[in-house]
Structures are given as structure tokens and as C-alpha cells.
């Protein structure tokens, strides 16, 4: 329902009057829409400042792809365990404090793409369970953020 396409149960639980006009309006109030989606993410564990995902490559001599993919998109591996199974992380990903999931994205005949998904990636998939949707929304958000002047 409305711009965020909330199910009725999500409207009841997560929709908020973010513009403080006395009513929740997910059809006409951009503030209520954005605030309600943010409230939904918060309820599912969004962690401010945590990246949604990191690039990942593989050390094929150690790669245990079946084990890495077994939990699907649920973050289940600490960095040490993730890399011990053949995932290669770089830079800030090596210091990630939480769990990671290996997210597989098929590419219609081309080799698949993989990312190391964090708890925040998982939160986005609670809104829409598709990993493709999650990555598209994340990349769109990054593009919008790049166009908005810093405050």
C-alpha cells in the first residue's frame, strides 16, 4: 500500500507520521514514506554506519563454496571463518565486526557476481527477499547520495 508498497500488516507495525501533520500518509507524504521505510529497517536491525556489503573474490586453493553458500543470505560467518573458507576480503572488510554472508547473484549466462553481505544487506532483504532487489536499491541509494551535497 502506498509508495513503499507496504503490506497491511507492515503499515500497522511500521508506518509513522514523520512529518508530524497528525496523520500517516504513505500515498502523498514523502516524509512519511521515507520515515516509515527507515522505521521498518530499524525494526529489523539496521545498524547506522555499517556497510551493506563488501567486494569479495576467492582463493581457489581454499575455496569451500558449498559451505559459504549454505546459509544463503543470512550472515553466518565471522571474517576469520569467512576467509578460512576461501573468501578474499580487502581493506575495511577485514575489520568488519559482525557476521558476513556470501551472496550469489546469477548473471544470465555470464559468470555470477558475489558480494560479502552484512547484517544491513540482510535487513534490506527483509523488505523484499530478492538479493537482486536489495543490491539494486543499495546501488540506487549510493547514486542518490553521491548527488546530494554533504551537510
Model-derived segments and spans:
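C-terminal soluble interaction/assembly domains
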Residues: 59-151
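Flexible, glycine-rich surface segments
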Residues: 1-100
